[in-house]
Amino acid sequence: MTLQEKYARVILESCLKVDKNQPLFVSYNIERSDFVRIVAKIAFEMGVKDIYFDCSDPYIKHEALLNLEVDELKGLTFWNKKMWDVYAEKDAAFLMLASETPGLMKDVDPEKLSAMTKYAQETRRGFDARRDKSELAWCIAAVPTTAWAEELFKESANPVEDLWNSIFDICSIDRKSVV
């Protein structure tokens, strides 16, 4: 078992405690589709039959924010988070894979970015309310992006691998017994 597989298993079994037949909702950055495939494989092996993938591409969001007005942006599906509420009603386990792209939005109008963040939150109020009442299983787990890794490991020949190794070390993934 690779360290990424072990990390995915720890997230699903120990952090989220996903039950057989429980729906799973995975929010992630498109750059980490490789890790999401590992998560899906393990989830299916655990008996999960319903997985919703909420994929985002920060570079496409960036271009949209630079070129469209707020009303036009609201028509784009990646800011409409209604499926979060749909899966909250199904008592899904929610896995948010956090992947940063440092500095990407620095040239975006802060008011526009704020408006779209607020809109996304408005479209997932059901999820937020149930999460805030601890009625849902949810977990935020870090996965590297190239830009994030290069920002942290400027001198490294393999910054993504180094960031993965840091995550594994922080989470004790490389130890025999993680939990």
Residue locations for each model-derived region?
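Active-site bordering "gate/hinge" segments
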Residues: 1-179
